[in-house]
């Protein structure tokens, strides 16, 4: 009898160790869609594209653990409703991220009333996703087109307070082993091997510090880099470019692996396609990304 009890106890200990080990956590499959742009006059096929993408995702086997819509959902609250109703037919849960077509310096409250928090975290298996509102990291409503050097405009004081609150919240989060940032506008542009950056040096395409400004609260990129460094986050899912790209960016000793999703509404750039990405995330946080084209989409 004593031997039997010892055997049972040993089995429980072994099972406990296995369940607590990283290998015991199943990998996660995340579908990222972006830039659906429902209601945009220059994207008349946007809704049809989204409906096609939803059908393709529902046909996946096995089904993804979650779907992330990384910004530029729609132009108006009516378009948001259309997008939500279309996405409601997905078998997987959907997480929304705000983009520059969703949140402006005048309508943050409207977005929150419709979608809930514009920055938050969620967990899939042992992977934590940190959703960040990139619209609180510079004024993307009043950027100066073609300005050299790139110079993002500071947020109005009332919205700057919201930015400070978000960065304070980010600083209060706990660093864990597997953590991924998600936002619409990427933290960095892509450095090209022949020189220059993609899409351009225009401050519209990435997060920048305001130049020639002594207000430390306007060091948007620096503050986010510091926050991600403290959280040991080195992977970011983003959209905004309408072009699927994977690249690594550095700032001092900080390194970030960026996975840019294609757009659902329309593509921008040579070779770009309309579609979505499927991210397979290992139990240790490694990310493998596959681009999937939207069937029959223009």
Please state what every model-predicted region is.
Residues 2-14:
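Bacterial N-terminal signal peptides that target proteins for export
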Residues 12-22:
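Bacterial N-terminal signal peptides
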Residues 25-82:
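N-terminal active-site segment of His-dependent metallophosphoesterases
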Residues 35, 71-72, 99-100, 184, ...:
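Active-site glycine-centered loops adjacent to acidic/histidine catalytic or metal-binding residues
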Residues 78-178, 204-207, 223-231, 235, ...:
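Extended active-site neighborhood of metal-dependent phosphoesterases/phosphodiesterases
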Residues 175-191:
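Short acidic, glycine-rich surface-loop motifs adjacent to enzyme active sites
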Residues 187-208:
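Active-site His/acidic residue clusters
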Residues 283-298:
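Acidic, His/Gly-rich catalytic cores of divalent-metal-dependent hydrolytic chemistry
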């Amino acid at each position: 009898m004593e031997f039997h009890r010892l055997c049972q106890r040993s089995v429980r200990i072994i099972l406990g160790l296995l369940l607590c080990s990283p290998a015991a956590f199943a990998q996660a499959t995340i579908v990222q869609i972006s830039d659906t742009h429902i209601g945009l006059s220059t994207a008349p096929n946007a809704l049809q594209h989204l409906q096609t993408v939803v059908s393709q995702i529902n046909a996946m086997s096995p089904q993804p653990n979650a779907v992330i819509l990384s910004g530029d959902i729609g132009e108006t609250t009516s378009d948001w409703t259309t997008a939500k109703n279309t996405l409601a037919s997905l078998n997987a849960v959907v997480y929304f991220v705000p983009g520059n077509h969703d949140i402006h310096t005048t309508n943050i409250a409207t977005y929150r009333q419709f979608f809930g928090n514009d920055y938050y975290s969620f967990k899939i298996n042992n992977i934590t996703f940190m959703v960040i509102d990139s619209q609180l990291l510079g004024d993307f409503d009043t950027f100066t087109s073609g300005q050299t050097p790139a110079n993002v405009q500071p947020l109005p004081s009332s919205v700057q307070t919201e930015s400070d609150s978000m960065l304070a919240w980010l600083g209060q989060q706990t660093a864990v082993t597997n953590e991924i940032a998600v936002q619409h506008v990427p933290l960095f542009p892509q450095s090209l091997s022949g020189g220059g950056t993609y899409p351009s040096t225009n401050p519209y395409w990435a997060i920048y510090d305001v130049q020639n400004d002594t207000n430390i609260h306007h060091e948007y990129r620096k503050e986010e880099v510091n926050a991600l460094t403290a959280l040991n986050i080195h992977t970011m899912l983003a959209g905004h470019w309408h072009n699927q790209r994977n690249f690594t960016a550095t700032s001092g000793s900080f390194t970030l692996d960026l996975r840019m999703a294609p757009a659902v509404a329309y593509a921008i750039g040579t070779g770009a396609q309309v579609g979505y990405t499927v991210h397979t995330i290992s139990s240790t946080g490694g990310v493998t990304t596959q681009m999937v084209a939207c069937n029959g989409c223009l």
